[in-house]
Amino acid sequence: MDKKRNDKDRKRFKRKMHIRKSIFGTAERPRMTVFRSNKRISVQVIDDVEGKTLAAVSTMEEALRSLKVNVESGAKVGEEIGKRLKEKNIDTVVFDRNGYLYHGVVKAVADGARKTGIKF
């Protein structure tokens, strides 16, 4: 499977694995991971000890379906995940950029979550 990946995906996968060695989420401080494609953005908050997703937001949801993949949409997704975390009384997370550069949409998601009071 790894041989089928193109160069860009291989480099992202290598960065992702390097990052994941040091990032681990707990129930008190779960891991917030970002995935972006050309059409969608999704964010999950994961408790790695239990192996469960605590909250998730995606542009595939009905309320966010009209959003495109751009910085403004990333900020809206970040704010939505922040609201859902506040409902579950989670105010601190570990940010996992998932191998993507901390720029553009990924940064906008982080800034949107920070705007709601989430710390990382």
Curated annotation (Swiss-Prot):
GO cellular component: cytosolic large ribosomal subunit
Keywords recorded for this protein, A-Z: Ribonucleoprotein, Ribosomal protein, RNA-binding, rRNA-binding
Any GO BP: translation
InterPro entries: Ribosomal_uL18_bac-type, Ribosomal_uL18_bac/euk
GO MF annotations in UniProt: 5S rRNA binding; structural constituent of ribosome
Pfam family, one: Ribosomal_L18p
Domain of life: Bacteria
Transmembrane segments: none
Primary role: This is one of the proteins that bind and probably mediate the attachment of the 5S RNA into the large ribosomal subunit, where it forms part of the central protuberance.
Family to which the UniProt record says this protein belongs: Belongs to the universal ribosomal protein uL18 family.
Self-association and partners: Part of the 50S ribosomal subunit; part of the 5S rRNA/L5/L18/L25 subcomplex. Contacts the 5S and 23S rRNAs.
HAMAP family referenced in this protein's UniProt entry, alphabetically: Ribosomal_uL18_B
Protein's UniProt name: Large ribosomal subunit protein uL18
